């Protein structure tokens, strides 16, 4: 697994991860931040490419409500309501996920959750194939308040300006392939 964050007070930019194999991990590609990390906590121009995953609980997680700090379970960090943007507000700009095969997933194909007051600017998923384990185990997709235990969920996405889905296949989930909330533009190619 590759994790970016959660303590990224100076930001993370221009990072490219490629040619990886993840097996038997709880998450595959995980980004975590939260309110309070600061306005310099900017994540931008990060790409993940040519990655194979097998038996991963949730292959793609971008979590703007990460709660594993002493103050991580406060109302300020966990509130799903838009709060004022100030010097404590982090931001997520552009991410690209390309040429990724995730098989035998368990909990969710993706769990992407930006802040309502500082939406993720742009996420691109290109040439992505997600399939689920026949005996999928339930679990929690992201470490945040209000994320309930589940299994075989599709692409859960929220608080995004632009979501680009180019040749994305989600096979074997229970329910909708894409569950979007507060996403301004979904572009399917």
Please provide the spans of the model-predicted regions.
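Extracellular/periplasmic carbohydrate-active domains that bind, remodel
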Residues: 1-189
